[in-house]
A protein has these predicted regions:
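Subtilisin-like peptidase catalytic core
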Residues: 2-124, 137, 147, 182-185, ...
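Surface-exposed or secretory-pathway low-complexity segments enriched in glycine-proline
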Residues: 340-372
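Catalytic-core segments of hydrolase enzymes
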Residues: 36, 95-223, 281-284
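Extracellular/periplasmic catalytic domains that process cell-envelope and extracellular macromolecules
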Residues: 30, 57-61, 89-92, 149-153, ...
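Secreted peptidase-domain scaffold signal
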Residues: 162, 304, 313-336, 354-358
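Catalytic-core environment of secreted peptidases
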Residues: 1-18, 27, 186-247
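Secretory-pathway/luminal and periplasmic proteins that interact with or process carbohydrate-rich
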Residues: 47, 75, 165-166, 285-293
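Hydrolase catalytic cores
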Residues: 37-41, 66-71, 95, 99, ...
Length: 372
């Protein structure tokens, strides 16, 4: 069911849960949001800090960020706070919802997330309130009638899959109409923390803690110098800090989505949300071939080393690792085929041609000689 912002706001008022978004002089207490924002939109090539996915050069050629703060320094938000953020974003021009958060409960079905109820979770009786307002507001944000970009019929929502090592995506990311992002480390293997399995759509770099002397395996991005965070900086500079998680993987994908939307506009193309997301999810690099044997992982929740059976991740990290270049080529309409340098490859061109059309291929003399 799709709702209007007036209907959703009406429910908020009737239930006494109305929460108006407002700009307040409050610091990003954890640095989490600032770190995520830097991955997407830090200015590139200025000799400072880090480069980002879609930040541009500082000449009005990069992504624009809208901040909708829902946590207020805590690690949770109410159903109404989340709903208000999506309505505000949709009504004020946002075309991508970058959502590095999710529900920590073992929710495995859409109805559990939306309507709540009483469930048996991990052997315990748990009562969940559900998130009907958030779901309705998210659908409002995604409604093609509320699209905020000329190259898209419907906005895009990207979520972190979750950091609980669970064999399914957390919600709202597991919903079928959004993108849930898993995380891999610098070794191209799953981060030991990442969720995986049903609901997960695509993977991206999320970093991984190795030891106290080697933070470089994590993701470096913008920080808040006076934030109450434990993340390490560079040489004491906490304006740039290391973090790990699907929260860091998520903005890599959101940044690539932003590049794709911008490129589609440049080419004068328009896509439905389903078409656009399909191009994204098929423009990937294969991961499963790496998932053999075991991996040593340092669990920050128990402060101990453990071994991961990598086979359990096969086919469960999403379609593959996000690839910005492949995605932009797909938007352009240019097929991409990866091959090893110095190796020969046979390509079945029937996969790329209409069998009812005629094609003429001209090969110059130099190419003929090279081909033998």
């Amino acid at each position: 069911t799709l709702y209007s912002s007036a209907q959703i706001n009406g429910v908020l008022k009737e239930t006494g849960q109305e929460k108006r978004l407002q700009i307040v002089p409050e610091t990003d207490l954890s640095g989490h949001g600032t770190h995520v924002a830097g991955i997407i939109g830090a200015t590139n090539n200025n000799g400072k800090g880090v480069s980002s996915i879609a930040g541009g050069t500082g000449n009005n050629d990069g992504v624009r960020l809208m901040t909708c703060q829902i946590f207020e320094g805590s690690m949770s938000a109410s159903d109404s706070q989340n709903a208000a953020a999506y309505i505000y974003a949709a009504d004020n021009g946002a075309c991508i919802a970058q959502c590095s958060y999710g529900n920590s409960y073992a929710i495995t079905e859409d109805d559990m997330y939306i309507n709540g109820g009483e469930f048996k979770i991990d052997g315990k009786d748990v009562k969940l309130d559900g998130s009907p307002l958030e779901n309705a507001a998210l659908r409002y944000f995604l409604d093609p009638a509320n699209s905020n970009h000329p190259s898209l019929e419907g906005n895009i929502a990207v979520f972190a899959a979750g950091n609980h090592s669970q064999p399914y995506s957390s919600y709202p990311g597991a919903l079928p109409y959004v993108i849930s992002v898993t995380a891999f480390g610098a070794d191209y293997l799953p981060g030991g923390y990442t969720n995986y399995g049903p609901g997960c759509k695509i993977a991206a770099p999320g970093g991984e803690y190795f030891d106290a002397d080697n933070y470089g395996m994590m993701i470096l991005s913008t920080g808040v110098s006076n934030a109450a965070q434990s993340s390490p900086g560079i040489g004491g500079d906490r304006n740039y800090v290391y973090m790990q998680g699907t929260s860091m993987a998520c903005p890599h994908v959101s940044g690539v989505v932003a590049l794709g939307i911008s490129y589609a506009k440049k080419l004068g193309k328009k896509f439905s949300r389903d078409e656009f997301q399909s191009l994204l999810l098929t423009s990937v690099n294969e991961l499963d071939g790496h998932f053999t044997g075991t991996k040593d992982y340092y669990d920050l929740s128990s402060y101990s080393w453990t071994k991961l059976d990598l086979s359990r991740y096969q086919g469960k990290m999403g379609t593959g690792a996000v690839d910005a270049w492949k995605f932009l080529m797909a938007i352009e309409g240019t097929p991409t085929i990866m091959t090893q340098a110095g190796k020969k490859m046979c390509i079945d061109i029937s996969r790329y041609c209409n069998p009812h059309d005629e094609y003429t291929i001209t090969v110059d003399a130099a190419t003929k000689t090279a081909l033998g």
